[in-house]
């Protein structure tokens, strides 16, 4: 165990899989963890003694089965292998850790998800400037970014990092600012030192400056990047030639969405177990590379009109040529995951079978180029020009590799015949030797008259002759008996031993030579990493565009018109997710919507509960997003002035773990919107103020609507509310207009028409919804009586004066006592123009306190 303890001391934070013969063993606390996670038996060696040791293990060939379970459970797993043949040493077998696999650093297919990246992240900050870096070692993508806390938090959430590197001194600050993550590894301060980080990065890329990557060396993201490269060293990942560049995430190139928006719009994940996210509906990609790229496009919609026009026009070209669509889909579907295969090539973790798949996939590139060779396909021809047929790589693989190459190189027949003369000679010797064994068998059968005689092999005796007991009296005297079984005897002969030496010697030499030739092949392929990665990039792009075309045809989407105006006009728009879930005989009811900065800046949307207000908000955002990732959209027509930020405050939720109520979460999200508005923002607000009392809620909703209306950037806003009193704002604010989701009211029921029409609604029909939910009749009658009483005595709408704005600001209160008169004077004296949103909320809280006292 001394060897084990010595190795374990080097990896105290990892679960150590210690190779012992044909098993991986775990000991002590590692054994307890492994037993619990994997469901394997926990045993004890030396039970009851001072040297009692807990252990649990599994066969070495089951590594891939168990490894992903350990990593998914958040464990860092150190794999300790035998570094020499036990047969060739008389002392303890030399062992060492050959790989440290962590949740964020993995190349194993069992751990990785085909359609998702597996990002390792690192975060570091200098005062208020935060840097972040992301690496997916399985694809070679290395990214950096810098910005304020909120920006980096959004990136960390959107990129779904599986593991995060953090400076030890920032441990508590990181948790306070970013929350809890399941897998975090802490480094000492010196790992984030600027000189150390820059040296690490420059050494990896073999450059003296980072200007070639367009990155300023003062970028805080580089410090995070340096720690990632250091972590790869620490985890025994030395071969990294597939990481050929750093890409900078530039905020100004993409639509800004905070983490609330990505979650509220359910872009990647649904908020319910049975629900569907947007990506579930729009993903018509045919390859893993395309699926991963589509996810990236969705969290980073474009602002560049030129790039968007290229995508839309490419989709249009494919739609107009359906034969091309079906042919491209067929070719793309047959591609292997080139990004991850080339990563395995570089790290020498590739199997012979996967190299055959690489050859077949590269062969498909020629077919795809041919399909895109028509120069009338102006946009798609650009992709044709960007693809490389890789003829020299295909030729090398064709000459070297057997078409029937196995998964495991140890099974042999990896290298093609006639590629290496020495290998051909050894194979001939091995085959002829086996033929000779068959001749020996036939000869001895004839000589002895034992027709059931057979020649077999095992690792103990090598080749032997087996004779059943009923024939053992016929055995020649020169045969040497080696083993007695219940029903048979086993013998060897000098002739058998001579040929055994030749055959086994040849087979061992074949194994060694094939391994060397296979490594030589991989070494050659490493030189072509960049060209294969470039093909992978463009094939993934093409896959997304073909997927968009397929989506547009199947779901009847149309090409949007994008421009740099301030207008947003959607004709007969539909919600892509809801529409896809409806039965065929229940078509989605489309809606028209128009926003602009001159007359229709804010639409105040009222209507009954369950009428579809929230769906209209989300559908508008999703149509904009689809347009700005290059997809067609679910609408008859869509004219969209480029949106640079999308904000949502949709749905009720709390954050109990952080001690935040539903209302506090609502205010946090609203504050994020107010503090980050830009020139071309789209703001979606749903039921602002419902987390508190009616008067507080109306006051806050009113104040936020007014703030957005008067903001110099005039953000386009959809404001869904159940406070019908807010309809009064349209009379005093020139760019606020009322619309409602209409209903048809009958004697005993309400029919939801789901149609957006001009004008405000005065009823929520909440009692009707309760009735639909199956509430008892007596309860419903009681509720109706109470509603009538409340409407008579607490008609807030009647309190709101429409005469002038100053009265409107005070009409929430019935000012008929001295305390309220004093409060009135205090409010009138306020300079509204100088109040920040936060100060307004503080003042509101103070008013609430006075009214309660």
Language-model segment annotations:
Residues 1-317, 326, 330-333, 337-346, ...:
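Charged catalytic and DNA/RNA-contacting regions of genome-maintenance
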Residues 2-6, 13, 522, 540, ...:
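Conserved phosphate-binding elements of NTP-dependent enzyme cores
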Residues 28-31, 218, 286-287, 291, ...:
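ATPase nucleotide-binding head domains, primarily ABC-like/P-loop NTPase cores
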Residues 45-57, 206-217, 268, 278-282, ...:
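Short hinge/gating elements
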Residues 80, 103-112, 239, 376-379, ...:
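Active-site phosphate-binding and catalytic loops of NTP-dependent enzymes
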Residues 193-200, 256, 267-269, 360-435, ...:
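Amphipathic heptad-repeat alpha-helical coiled-coil/stalk segments that mediate oligomerization
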Residues 347, 351, 361-364, 417-418, ...:
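Charged, surface-exposed helical/loop "interaction arms" that form contiguous linear patches used
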Residues 402, 485, 489-523:
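Extended, charged coiled-coil "arm/hinge" scaffolds of SMC/Rad50-like chromosome-maintenance ATPases
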């Amino acid at each position: 165990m001394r060897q084990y303890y010595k190795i374990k001391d080097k990896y105290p934070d990892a679960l150590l899989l210690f190779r012992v013969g044909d098993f991986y063993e775990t000991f002590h606390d590692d054994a307890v963890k492994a037993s619990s996670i994997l469901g394997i038996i926990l045993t004890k060696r030396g039970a009851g003694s001072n040297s009692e040791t807990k252990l649990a293990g599994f066969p070495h060939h089951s590594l891939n089965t168990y490894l992903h379970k350990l990593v998914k459970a958040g464990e860092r797993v150190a794999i300790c292998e035998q570094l020499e043949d036990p047969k060739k040493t008389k002392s303890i077998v030399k062992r060492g850790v050959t790989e440290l696999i962590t949740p964020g650093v993995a190349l194993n297919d069992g751990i990785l998800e085909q359609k998702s990246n597996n990002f390792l992240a690192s975060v570091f900050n200098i005062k208020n400037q935060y840097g972040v870096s992301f690496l997916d070692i399985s694809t070679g993508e290395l990214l950096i970014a810098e910005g304020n806390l909120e920006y980096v938090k959004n990136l960390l959430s959107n990129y779904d990092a599986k593991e995060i590197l953090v400076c030890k001194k920032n441990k508590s600050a990181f948790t306070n600012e970013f929350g809890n993550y399941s897998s975090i590894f802490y480094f000492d301060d010196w790992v984030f030192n600027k000189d150390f980080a820059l040296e690490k990065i420059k050494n990896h890329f073999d450059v003296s400056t980072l200007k070639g990557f367009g990155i300023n060396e003062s970028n805080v993201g580089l410090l995070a990047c340096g720690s990632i490269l250091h972590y790869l060293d620490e985890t025994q990942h030395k071969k990294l030639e597939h990481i050929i560049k750093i890409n900078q995430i530039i905020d100004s190139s993409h639509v800004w969405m905070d983490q609330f928006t990505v979650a509220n719009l359910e872009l990647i994940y649904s908020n319910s177990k049975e629900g569907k996210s947007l990506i579930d509906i729009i993903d018509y990609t045919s390859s893993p590379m395309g699926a991963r790229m589509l996810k990236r496009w969705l969290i980073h919609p474009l602002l560049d009109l030129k790039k968007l026009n290229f995508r839309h026009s490419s989709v249009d070209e494919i739609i107009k040529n359906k034969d091309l669509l079906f042919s491209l889909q067929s070719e793309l579907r047959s591609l292997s995951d080139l990004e991850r295969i080339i990563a395995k090539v570089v790290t020498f973790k590739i199997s012979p079978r996967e190299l055959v798949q690489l050859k077949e996939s590269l062969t498909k590139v020629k077919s795809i180029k041919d399909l895109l060779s028509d120069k009338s396909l102006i946009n798609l021809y650009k992709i044709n020009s960007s693809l490389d047929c890789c003829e020299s790589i295909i030729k090398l693989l064709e000459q070297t590799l057997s078409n029937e190459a196995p998964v495991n190189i140890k099974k042999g027949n990896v290298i093609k015949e006639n590629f290496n003369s020495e290998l051909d000679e050894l194979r001939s010797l091995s085959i002829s030797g086996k033929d000779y064994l068959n001749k020996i068998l036939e000869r001895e059968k004839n000589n002895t008259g034992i027709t059931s005689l057979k020649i077999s092999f095992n690792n103990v005796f090598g080749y032997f002759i087996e004779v059943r007991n009923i024939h053992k009296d016929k055995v020649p005297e020169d045969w040497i008996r080696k083993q007695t079984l219940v029903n048979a005897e086993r013998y060897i002969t000098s002739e058998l031993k001579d040929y055994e030496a030749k055959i086994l010697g040849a087979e061992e030499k074949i194994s060694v030579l094939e391994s060397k030739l296979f490594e030589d092949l991989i070494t050659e392929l490493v030189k072509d990493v960049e060209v294969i990665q470039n093909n992978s990039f463009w094939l993934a792009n093409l896959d997304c565009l073909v997927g968009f075309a397929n989506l547009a045809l199947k779901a009847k989407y149309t090409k949007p018109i994008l421009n740099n105006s301030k207008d947003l006009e959607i004709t007969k728009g539909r919600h892509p997710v809801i529409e896809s879930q409806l039965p065929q005989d229940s078509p989605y009811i489309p809606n028209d919507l128009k926003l602009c900065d001159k007359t229709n800046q804010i639409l105040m949307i009222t209507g009954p509960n369950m009428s579809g207000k929230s769906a209209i908000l989300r559908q508008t955002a999703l149509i904009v997003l689809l347009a700005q990732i290059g997809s067609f959209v679910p609408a008859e027509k869509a004219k969209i002035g480029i949106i640079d930020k999308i904000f949502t405050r949709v749905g009720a939720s709390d954050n109990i773990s952080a001690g935040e109520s539903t209302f506090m979460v609502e205010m946090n999200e609203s504050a994020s919107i107010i503090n980050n508005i830009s020139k071309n923002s789209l703001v979606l607000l749903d039921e602002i103020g419902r987390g508190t009392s009616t008067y507080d809620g109306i006051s806050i909703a009113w104040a936020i609507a007014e703030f957005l209306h008067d903001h110099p950037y005039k953000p386009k806003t959809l404001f869904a509310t159940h406070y019908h009193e807010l309809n009064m704002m349209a009379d005093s604010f020139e760019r606020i207009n009322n619309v409602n989701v209409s209903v048809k009211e009958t004697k005993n029921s309400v029919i939801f028409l789901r149609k957006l029409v001009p004008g405000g609604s005065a009823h929520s029909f909440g009692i009707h919804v309760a009735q639909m939910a199956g509430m008892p009749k007596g309860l419903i009658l009681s509720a109706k009586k109470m509603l009538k009483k409340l409407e008579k005595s607490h008609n807030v709408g009647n309190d709101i004066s429409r005469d002038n704005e100053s009265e409107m600001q005070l009409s929430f209160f019935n000012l008929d006592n001295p305390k309220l008169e004093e409060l009135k004077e205090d409010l009138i004296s306020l300079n509204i123009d100088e109040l920040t949103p936060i100060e307004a909320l503080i003042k509101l809280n103070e008013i609430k306190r006075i009214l309660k006292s």
